[in-house]
Curated annotation (Swiss-Prot):
Listed name of the protein: Atlastin-2
Family affiliation: Belongs to the TRAFAC class dynamin-like GTPase superfamily. GB1/RHD3 GTPase family. GB1 subfamily.
PROSITE patterns recorded: G_GB1_RHD3
Origin species: Homo sapiens (Human)
Modified residues (Phosphoserine): S24
Binding site for Mg(2+): S108
Stretches assigned to the Lumenal side: 498-499
EC number: 3.6.5.-
Length: 583
């Protein structure tokens, strides 16, 4: 950066605490790049340091924190604001270059060469000396993940464009996908969030572009597209496929031109392709305004196998260094910078802070569906198909029992048929070969049983509708209320209880209004909601008052009849014995 910019930055007040990570493991000091010159330190263990100290020394700052216990993400708003809201940059249009991809594929390693270029872009030897360790973003050899969440370099570079304007350049490092501690949702969230906030997303791949790489890209970009409210154009800007360890230079040469030819072949939509493969390629073309590809050779055996490798150029193959000198300026040279745009409008540093806040809230909420692995998605589809088939079998069989053209069936017979057919449907579900295991499939069997019970409840209502007495229950109930109120009104009026008589007349009038309204609703089909309310009131009166009263009266009549029969029988026996004695 220019000296004036550094002086202005040094004068900015910075308060509060930031998270940074410092290497405490002595053995890691060999693999990690230690602090040198202008590129700051490597950090590993979570520490809190004063932001004044952090701003005095360039270093990576974690702005999106990954919580492994609940697989959620948190934005460190204070850290992001203190980086992007510095007075000399906050109103500048921003360029965000992000590197994403699978874990342990050298994303942070690549970003550190980008840092070298940004600090020495005016020099032909920006790539550094042969014995100079690689510093900047934390990186190391090995098979365990290093970066979590999203980190940015805390020094925002102010660059003069060829057209005379100034832009701010921010470098972003992301958590590697598909490690042993991250879910598909974690990977999708990090990739989508970095793609949504970057102007250039470098998709870091190893050796080749495989079909699963494209499918994961489709899933992750769709997850990001869903989070953006209204999209009338391609939602994302530039995607650069970076193929590391390219082993086929005899087919496609290293660099941009070879990558362009290779990418065109990989993303070509062919008529004889399966529809699934065509859709993946169409989706990628529809999501990004610009697509590119760069083929990078293997850095050499010393880089891959030497545990003490610290990024010195003397240990890296010449082919790799040559192509690296072409790649980094392709992304970061002033004439090649891509300014961040959202919905066609340029984004400033100040704007990007607000977009980060808005996007992280979306991913912290439950509005978006949770992305799933291919196995889980296939197992779900497999089980749902089995549920649908078994439910369809149950419905068709029940239609034969009490369908629209079938007569009314006794409730006890209907329930017996239901239980038999439910068992048949469950057996059919179990007989289908399904993915996911017994515990996973059990949830879908429970879902099937619940759906069958819900369908059975509808069949009960349909069957009850065929019962003429059930259909006449509402008018009969209302008429019974009117008749009872008429009798009670007459009796209470006769004995002088006029207030009760008036109340009974009022209830009788309401019942008459309900009866007339119900008849109109059934005749015209209008005001069906009112008709439903009247049916519910009548149902409540029937179940809570009239039916219990009728049952009690019937029990009393039956009891009286039995008593009279017993008495009559005893009387007959006594009379018979008396006649025998007389004879």
């Amino acid at each position: 950066m220019a000296e004036g910019d550094e002086a202005a930055r040094g004068q900015q007040p910075h308060q509060g605490l930031w998270r940074r990570r410092r290497t405490s493991d002595p053995s890691a000091a060999v693999n990690h790049v230690s602090s040198t010159t202008s590129l700051g330190e490597n950090y590993e263990d979570d520490d809190l340091v004063n932001s004044d100290e952090v701003m005095k020394k360039p270093c990576p700052v974690q702005i999106v924190l990954a919580h492994e216990d609940d697989h959620n993400f948190e934005l460190d708003e204070e850290a992001l604001e203190q980086i992007l809201l510095q007075e000399h940059i906050r109103d500048l249009n921003i360029v965000v270059v992000s590197v994403a991809g699978a874990f342990r594929k050298g994303k942070s390693f690549l970003l550190d060469f980008m840092l070298r270029y940004m600090y020495n872009k005016d020099s032909q030897s920006w790539i550094g000396g042969n014995n100079e360790p690689l510093t900047g973003f934390t990186w190391r050899g090995g098979c365990e993940r290093e970066t979590t969440g999203i980190q940015v370099w805390n020094e925002v570079f102010v660059i003069d464009r060829p057209n005379g304007t100034k832009v701010a350049v921010l470098l972003m490092d992301t958590q590697g996908a598909f490690d042993s501690q991250s879910t598909i949702k974690d990977c999708a969230t990090v990739f989508a969030l970095s793609t949504m906030t970057s102007s250039v997303q470098v998709y870091n791949l190893s050796q080749n572009i495989q079909e699963d790489d494209l499918q994961h890209l489709q899933l992750f970009t769709e997850y990001g597209r869903l989070a953006m409210e209204e999209i009338y154009q391609k939602p994302f800007q530039t995607l650069m496929f970076l193929i590391r360890d390219w082993s086929y230079p005899y087919e496609h040469s290293y660099g941009l031109e070879g990558g362009k030819q290779f990418l065109e072949k990989r993303l070509q939509v062919k008529q004889n392709q399966h529809e699934e493969l065509q859709n993946v390629r169409k989706h990628i073309h529809n999501c990004f305004s610009n697509l590119g590809c760069f083929l990078l050779p293997h850095p050499g055996l010393k880089v891959a196998t030497n545990p003490s490798f610290d990024g010195r150029l003397k240990d890296i193959d010449e082919d790799f260094k040559r192509e690296l000198r072409n790649l980094v300026p392709l992304l970061l040279a002033p004439e090649n910078l891509v300014e961040k745009e959202i919905s066609g409008s340029k984004v400033t540093c100040r704007d990007l802070v607000e977009y980060f806040k808005a996007y992280i809230k979306i991913y912290q909420g439950e509005e978006l569906p949770h992305p799933k692995s291919m196995l889980q998605a296939t197992a779900e589809a497999n089980n749902l198909a089995a549920v649908a088939g078994a439910r369809d079998t149950y419905c068709k069989s029940m239609e034969q029992v009490c369908g629209g053209d079938k007569p009314y069936i006794a409730p006890s017979d209907l329930e017996r048929k239901h239980l038999d057919l439910k068992e048949v449907a469950i057996k059919q579900f179990r007989s289908v070969k399904k993915m996911g295991g017994d515990e996973f499939c059990r949830r879908y069997q429970d879902q099937l049983e619940a759906e069958i019970e819900e369908t059975y409840a509808n069949f009960i209502k349909h069957n009850d509708g065929k019962n003429i007495f059930y259909a006449a229950r509402t008018p009969a109930t209302l008429f019974a209320v009117m008749f009872a109120m008429y009798i009670i009104s007459g009796l209470t009026g006769f004995i002088g209880l006029n207030s009760i008589a008036v109340l009974c007349n009022l209830v009788m009038g309401l019942a008459l209004i309900f009866l007339c309204t119900w008849a109109y609703v059934k005749y015209s089909g209008e005001f069906r909601e009112i008709g439903t309310v009247i049916d519910q009131i009548a149902e409540t009166l029937w179940e809570q008052v009239l039916k219990p009263l009728g049952d009690n009266l019937m029990e009393e009549n039956i009891r009286q009849s039995v008593t009279n029969s017993i008495k009559a029988g005893l009387t007959d026996q006594v009379s018979h014995h008396a006649r025998l004695k007389t004879d």
